[in-house]
């Protein structure tokens, strides 16, 4: 398995002319209901126009678009990376008195935060499907979809994890001035994803990102964890921001003129590789690790013909033609019996 890239490995990687400079690992399509505004056909066209070698789809709590994404991007000559953004509950929201004092009666409703998972292999994609289902089973009544960290551990094989941006569990704990909890959460993720965990850095010009970035980098370096640069893409271009903001208001039941509501920024768009290189010029290893992650993800979901049940047993040695003939005869028999029963009942 390839190890995460460190600063001292950068020169060898950047010298290879065949490697892309940057890979988007956090993209939400229109299948992120009331969050994303990128139809997958448009995403495929944008990937080609921007000459992306690979791109990941990480919709919120679902894989609705995974197969369409895989087929469209592969047909366009772009490597599709199957992923998922999951809300994870570390079950620690009441263990720290500082958090209870901060949130009061609302402490129980605070879920730890979002992480991104990327499928490295067929086993990893199978685990993504399990997690995408169970995320709706763990929550209690009236709670938002999320998954317990112990459940995440049960289905972690074959997956790469990114720690999330300002909405991630590590950054959220730092925003609440709970550094010990942030460290404990990071340590727990390291246990679950050894050699497959990256500390995520995002720069959308959001206050929460500015307040937590230095601490996140410090934590990563202190624990010898690799960094990765991402842009949480919700829409295509900055000009789409206002329309997307209205979409978020619909999702939250708010008005655009309200200030006290969840808002993104025009920076949550699908930026070019050059824009990302300029944005993270001071953290080249975080950019290089996007390419390394793409290289570690070598599986994509494939379509298959419908698998229909067999209505008649013809034995192990029967040919497909014999099976079809037997099923046709069985259908005719049941139709005749049904017709006879109706005629007898109604005269």
Task: Label every model-predicted segment.
Residues 1-347:
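Phosphodiester-processing cores and adjacent nucleic acid-binding clamps
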């Amino acid at each position: 398995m390839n190890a995460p890239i460190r600063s001292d490995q950068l020169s060898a990687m950047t010298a290879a002319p065949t490697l892309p400079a940057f890979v988007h690992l956090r993209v939400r399509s229109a299948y992120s209901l009331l969050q994303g505004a990128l139809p997958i056909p448009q995403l495929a066209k944008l990937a080609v126009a921007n000459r992306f070698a690979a791109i990941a789809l990480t919709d919120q709590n679902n894989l609705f678009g995974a197969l369409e994404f895989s087929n469209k991007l592969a047909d366009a000559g772009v490597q599709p990376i199957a992923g998922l953004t999951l809300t994870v509950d570390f079950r620690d929201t009441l263990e720290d008195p500082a958090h209870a004092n901060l949130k009061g009666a609302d402490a129980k409703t605070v879920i730890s935060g979002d992480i991104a998972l990327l499928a490295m292999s067929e086993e990893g994609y199978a685990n993504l499907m399990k997690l995408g289902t169970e995320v709706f089973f763990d929550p209690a009544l009236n709670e938002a979809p999320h998954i317990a960290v112990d459940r995440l551990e049960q289905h972690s094989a074959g997956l790469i994890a990114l720690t999330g941006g300002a909405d991630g569990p590590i950054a959220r704990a730092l925003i609440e001035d709970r550094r010990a909890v942030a460290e404990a959460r990071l340590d727990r993720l390291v246990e679950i994803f050894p050699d497959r965990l990256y500390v995520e850095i995002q720069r959308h010009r959001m206050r929460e990102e500015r307040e937590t970035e230095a601490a996140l980098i410090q934590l990563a370096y202190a624990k010898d964890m690799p960094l990765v640069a991402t842009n949480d893409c919700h829409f295509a271009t900055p000009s789409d921001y206002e329309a997307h903001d209205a979409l978020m208001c619909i999702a939250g039941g708010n008005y655009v003129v309200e200030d006290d509501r969840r808002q993104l920024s025009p920076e949550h768009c699908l930026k070019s590789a050059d824009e990302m290189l300029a944005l993270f010029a001071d953290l080249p290893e975080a950019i290089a690790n996007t390419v390394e992650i793409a290289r570690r993800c070598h599986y994509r979901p494939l379509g298959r013909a419908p698998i229909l049940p067999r209505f008649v047993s013809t034995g192990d040695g029967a040919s497909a033609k014999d099976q079809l003939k037997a099923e046709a005869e069985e259908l005719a028999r049941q139709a005749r019996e049904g017709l006879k029963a109706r005629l007898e009942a109604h005269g």
